[in-house]
Amino acid sequence: AAGNNPSGASRQLPLHKGALGFLQTRKEYIMNKLWAGRSEAETSALADAFNSSIAVDGRMYQQDITGSMAHAAMLAKCGILTQADADQIIGGLAGILADLQSGALQLDMQAEDIHMFVEAELTSRIGDVGKKLHTARSRNDQVALDLRLYLKDEIAALQSLVLAVISSLHAQASAHKDTIMPGYTHLQRAQPITFGQQLLAYAMMLERDYGRLADAGRRMDASPIGCCALAGTTYPTDRVFEAQKLGFSAICENSLDGVSDRDFCVELMSACALIMMHLSRLSEELILWSSWEFQFIELDSGFTTGSSIMPQKKNPDMAELCRGKTGRVYGDLIALLTTLKGLPLAYNKDMQEDKEAVFDCVDTTKLCLQIMAPMLASMKAKPENMLLAAQKGFINATDLADYLTKKGVPFRSAYKISGQLVAYCIAHDTVLEQLPLETYKTYSDVFEDDLYIEISLKTCVARRISAGGTGPASVQAQLDSVAAFLAAHQ
């Protein structure tokens, strides 16, 4: 079916000749162009191909047909169509939808767009009654409706995928809430933390991403249908009835705004860009951690590849692709922003370019989320290597300074003494834990035997008792918070 296209690529569906013979030839198609009012001249084949968008917007066939069914019902309710005509139209549309979903009917790549295809197919099936469907609407509000309906469904799909990644992160974080590793700043070993807390940081980033998707969905939840081309309609329509029938909570209150803005696309794409930024940062760490230089984790073979020439390689290609595809999503967002920035109200044909950008953006984000959840779930941590790394780099130096401060030494003085001791250790190829007490006392008389407990990595982690910190109680609170979020949204 045209609606299933996870890759985001424009899919060339087989040419449909029409069971009842419509659009048999290009000439007949031109003669039956539904917008051919003023002009009788034929457009060139090149212009027709250039103007066509069905290869992109064809995926919205279900939304287009659903919207048309609701429109026919509204026209009948308001007395603009007879109930008999509306029933015939709705029945014809239901048949088209069923045939598209089953594969009995395929999109015609010679059609200009999905709206023209559906209307022409409807007319071919039920005759002139089908020509009444477009009363009191324009393709301008029709495409805005289709896009909102389609993207509302995509938001729900994205949210489900975000939850799956959060769940994988939570499971790994729970298993490694006490696994000590070095925390980094500037990619330099900084302070001891737990692997669980590191993973929970990404879980909480994605929680906010989930919320941004929800926010985008709330602002998208207004129906543009009935705005017509730009100024509304002279017919006594009921836009609220039609909106409610389609599951919207409100209508676009200004007809110009309803047909001419795509900020709902931009907002969703911005949320996708942030999701991808977070996935990219996580991917970068997975790439680093799985390297021989770190050896903190091992990615499952199902999410890595080998080399065509180097037999020892296990390449983190899936993580690298998530990182690489982030730039693609950014490009989609910038492309649509650039398209919209200079457009006067109301509709302009430039806006046909919105769908390729937003579809690719959403498709790519979904694909990366789909790969990330199982890749994280199957990841194997190497706690022993994390601990070895934490034992190097003097990441307990801050705790040494804190020890002195708690003994009454001003922090800046304590900071200086701690730095001098680190320099001494480097010069003598040793570590803080192995320096004799006599050496410590040459720097300050306040040092006692208790300092060795204070600068042990386990103590360093346990003493981080502040809310949000890496201490056991704090990490457990973070785990509980993420678990509550998952329970509330799954």
Q: Where do the model's predicted regions map?
A:
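Intrinsic disorder/low-complexity segments
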Residues: A1-I30
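Short, conserved catalytic/metal-binding motifs centered on acidic residues
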Residues: G18, D141, L282
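A helix-coil-helix interface module used to build multimeric assemblies
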Residues: M31-G232, T237-A243, T305-G306, L321, ...
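Alpha-helical support elements that line or immediately flank enzyme active sites
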Residues: L151-V162, C272-M277, R281, T405
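Charged, flexible cofactor/metal-binding loops and thiol motifs
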Residues: S174, P182, Q188-G342, K349, ...
